[in-house]
From Swiss-Prot:
Name of protein: E3 ubiquitin ligase Rnf157
Description of how the protein assembles with itself and partners: Interacts with APBB1. Interacts with CHD1; CHD1-binding controls RNF157 stability. Also interacts with ATRN, MEGF8, TECR, MSI2, PLRG1, BYSL, MTERF3, PSMA1, MRPS18B, PRPF4, FASTKD2, SLC25A1, SMU1, CNOT9, MRPS2, MAGT1, FXR2, EMD, PSMD8, HDAC1, RAN, HSD17B12, TXNDC5 and MRPL19.
Lineage of origin: Eukaryota, Metazoa, Chordata, Craniata, Vertebrata
Organism: Rattus norvegicus
Top-level taxon in the UniProt lineage: Eukaryota
In-chain residues carrying the UniProt-annotated modification Phosphoserine: 662, 664-665
Reaction catalysis annotation: S-ubiquitinyl-[E2 ubiquitin-conjugating enzyme]-L-cysteine + [acceptor protein]-L-lysine = [E2 ubiquitin-conjugating enzyme]-L-cysteine + N(6)-ubiquitinyl-[acceptor protein]-L-lysine
Classification via Gene3D superfamilies: Zinc/RING finger domain, C3HC4 (zinc finger)
GO molecular function, one term: ubiquitin protein ligase activity
Length: 682
């Protein structure tokens, strides 16, 4: 350190006290800093000569002009550095001047020339009893390690006010006023040569000898506005502990921004409320960039990236000279209790603990979040409430029924239809909806379970067969007939085929555990109108034998000839469907097979779907080869609805076995030949 190199061999008592210029920057001679510095028990080389790592070099003049002895012993090499406990904190951003309610008038002074006096107010926090005094135009002196401030006039100080411990206390002394207009202009600011501070707020701990000499000092200056009014601005803050003066510097980026404040933030004021590293956006910030003091990165990988690949701070883009990691530790207290456990802190510190490159954690200590160590536990946002029972007619995760009965459909695991709506005066309206949407957890079941469920479904439906038919005129067609399919995606008219409906695949556990999102998808995108059904092409093929496996379809197909209904559009509103002779159709134009092939009818006389128990060709079918053909194109696998296929085509399909189909309910008892079912007429 130039002329000061002899200080390392001499005691503190031998330093020349009158030479005040020794600890002033810039020094009159020599260098202020040495070639290295010691921090955290380790020695580091100074890459930038005469560079103050924690701020501007001029800030060193606030530390004092007298050398002091360090009162603490050096910590062991493997012990963490102990932090000093600050019992008092004055919030410098709350320091302000408040005009008095009544203007003070001097004797013999005119009313128009009345002077304006101000009160000094600020907010502070204290963990001990404190005595606060305000000084004006004062100088600083240290006697026996205790800081004292002496104003140039005894009238330039307030009375001492005592406060108890508390948080967010307000200092307001109406009996004490100040008039900065009485001072000269140079006295409003701080002059290093004069060493006179315009404003000093001195808060001393008042709790006996244990904390004797511990104080907090806030230095401020005055400014005059163009309209003649004055304001006060904070200059620096200091802590005096055991005779050593510590200059307080602000670190940016580690404040607890989630705390509620008295003022409202404007909508256009964009603020960074996150505590993650600005480089990787995953770990918690714990590395301070010096000298700009931006806590913006983590020490996992980003600190090394800044050291070897970048030279500027990622926030202010100024060049930096050092990186300081601040890792907060505490003694292990055992497992955290539920009351002190914070999910935000745990999630933020887990990655840093696992990926930390230097695990120099002393025995008996654990790492805590820096935000928690400085600001206390973070406020966790309330968790998203789970779905509850909505009411009598609603279940969690399911949609209410839209049928005419107004009740929820019975939850079935075997039948693909929920219920049938009542008949109205205009015609028969069927509303067929699946009992449940296929959830992701139950989209694939074993083959044996599918065949067993379909067999049981066919057995139950065969018991409800009846010869009753709705009495309706041959020309009466229902106005609308919506067929609700359970599909995982939107229905595309060009890709939809008329493959028969399969039995509903439902979750074997809770009948009300289906996904709400898929239920909404099924109800919103699977309502097929009459026009959609009429534009769909399909061939409803009954299964063949019970042998396993699927044979490839025959390349031969019966040619499709136009029927009378297609040639005469006036006879039917829908010309896309071919009909059977009059004796083989019902009043609606649907196919009627003999005895076993008739459409099952429920107890109230309403027809159910004629192809109940068949499977639907949608996105949930994996192993079923669907037959696709447009209405205006001939497909090799499509034949005329309601007609028998040629024997040559039957031979190749004789061994075809569709999964999840029970052939007993759809075969012709007299001939072992599959028939083509007509699409649902509308």
């Amino acid at each position: 350190m130039g002329a000061l190199t002899s200080r390392q061999h001499a005691g503190v008592e031998e330093v020349d006290i009158p030479s005040n210029s020794v600890y002033r920057y810039p020094p009159k001679s020599g260098s202020y800093f040495a070639s290295h510095f010691i921090m955290g028990g380790e020695k580091f080389d100074c890459t930038h000569p005469e560079g103050y790592l924690f701020g501007e070099n001029s800030d060193l003049n606030f530390l004092g002009n007298r050398p002091v002895s360090f009162p603490y012993a050096a910590p062991p090499p493997h012990e963490p550095v102990k932090t000093l406990r600050s019992l008092i904190n004055i919030r410098k951003d709350t320091l302000r001047l408040v005009k008095c309610a009544e203007e003070v008038k001097s004797h013999g002074e005119e009313a128009g020339k009345a002077k304006v006096h101000y009160n000094v107010e600020f907010t502070f926090d204290t963990d001990a009893r404190v005595a606060i005094t305000i000084y004006y135009q004062a100088t600083e002196e240290f006697q026996n390690g205790i800081a004292s401030y002496i104003p140039k006039d005894n009238s330039l100080q307030s009375e001492t006010v005592h406060y108890k411990r508390g948080v967010c206390q307000q200092f307001c002394l109406p009996s004490h006023t100040v008039d900065p207009s009485e001072w000269a202009e140079e006295e409003l600011g701080f002059d290093l040569d004069r060493e006179v501070y315009p404003l000093v707020v001195h808060a001393v701990v008042d709790e006996g000898d244990e904390y004797f000499g511990h104080c907090h000092v806030l230095l401020g200056t005055f400014e005059k506005h163009s309209d003649g009014t004055f304001c006060v601005k904070p200059l620096k803050q200091k802590q005096v502990w055991d005779g050593v003066t510590y200059l307080l510097q602000e670190d940016y980026g580690i404040e607890n921004k989630s705390n509620t404040q008295d003022f409202k933030v404007a909508e256009d004021d964009v603020r960074d409320n996150s505590a993650e590293c600005v480089v990787c956006l995953s770990d918690v910030r714990d590395t301070l960039i010096l000298p700009c003091r931006h806590c913006a990165s983590c020490n996992v990988h980003c600190a090394d990236t800044l050291r070897y690949q970048a030279n500027n701070c990622p926030i202010c883009r100024l060049p930096f000279r050092a990186l300081l990691q601040i890792r907060a530790m505490r003694k292990k207290l055992g497992p955290l209790s539920p009351s002190s456990f914070n999910p935000i802190i745990s999630s933020q510190t887990s990655d840093s603990e696992e990926h930390s490159s230097s695990e120099n954690i002393p025995a008996g200590y654990e790492v805590v979040s820096l935000l928690e160590a400085l600001n206390g536990p973070l406020t966790s946002s309330p968790a998203v409430p789970p779905l509850h029972v909505l009411g009598d007619g609603h279940l969690s995760g399911m949609l209410p029924s839209y049928g005419s009965d107004g009740h929820l459909p019975p939850v079935r695991t075997l039948s693909p239809l929920d219920h049938l709506s009542d008949c109205n005066s205009q015609g028969l309206k069927l509303n067929k909806s699946l009992s449940k949407s296929i959830s992701q957890n139950s989209s694939v079941l074993h083959e044996e379970e599918d065949e067993r469920s379909c067999s049981e479904s066919d057995t139950q439906l065969s018991q409800r067969l009846s010869a009753q038919h709705p009495e309706e005129g041959p020309d009466v067609t229902p106005e609308s007939e919506n067929l609700t399919l359970s599909s995982s995606g939107a229905v595309d008219q060009s890709s939809c085929t008329g493959t028969p409906l399969s039995s509903t695949i439902s979750s074997p556990e809770d009948p009300a555990s289906s996904s709400l999102a898929q239920s909404v998808m099924s109800m919103a995108s699977s309502q097929i109108s009459t026009d959609t059904v009429s534009s769909m092409s399909g061939s409803y093929i009954a299964p063949g034998t019970e042998e396993e496996g699927e044979a490839p379809p025959s390349p031969r197909a019966a040619s499709r000839a136009p029927s009378e209904e297609e040639e005469t559009p006036a006879e039917s509103p829908d010309s896309n469907f071919a009909g059977l002779p009059a004796g083989e159709q019902d009043a609606e134009g649907n196919d009627i097979m003999e005895e076993e092939d008739r459409s099952p009818v429920q107890e109230d006389g309403q027809r159910t779907c004629a192809f109940l128990g068949m499977e639907c060709d949608n996105n949930n079918d994996f192993d079923v080869a669907s037959v696709k053909a447009l209405d205006n194109k001939l497909c090799s696998e499509v034949c005329l609805p309601g007609t028998w296929q040629h024997d040559a085509a039957i031979i190749n399909r004789h061994n075809t076995q569709r999964r999840r189909l029970s052939p007993s309910s759809l075969e012709d008892p007299e001939e072992d030949r599959p028939c083509v079912w007509d699409p649902l007429a509308v």
